[in-house]
Amino acid sequence: SMKRERIYLFDTTLRDGQQTPGVDFSVEDKIVIANMLDEFGFDYVEGGYPGANPTDTAFFEKKRTVKSRFVAFGMTKRAGISASNDPGLAALLQANSDCICFVAKSWDYHVRVALGCTNEENLESIRESVEAAKAAGKEPMVDCEHFFDGFKANPEYAMACAKAAHDAGARWVVLCDTNGGTLPSEI
């Protein structure tokens, strides 16, 4: 018999959709939309970035889905601070969510310029953030930001970022084409 593959659906309307010009969800808007997405049957509903703004922080004071896994989005811990002392990571761990989706740099250029740390420090931030989420009982996932640009520049390092996330226990490692410039033939 044919093996049936399971496709998991992840909705990011409440986080990435909110970055659309002219869109500014209130907490009430987010609650209504989360209920609709939950009823539609999405496996995951990404609710926003707790700690980044008052709306998202308030939205994560309660779990807002019944069937769907409720996802908090945020950055990996900063280099030079322990996981237990990083306020951004603390906000994610305290959010009433089932999962944490970490956005992680996977392009060595961004590690150097945006994060101002070494490649190894970034790998450590990925590992320790995923481990902290797991220890807190959250399902960890990692968005490897600008993965394909990073892969073109330094394939070994981009893959090392994805592998660090996987080996630390991330349930999902997402290879993001952040700029949307990668053609199917290149993958």
Regions found by a protein language model. Give the residues of each.
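Alpha/beta enzyme core
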Residues: 4-9, 15-16, 20-45, 52, ...
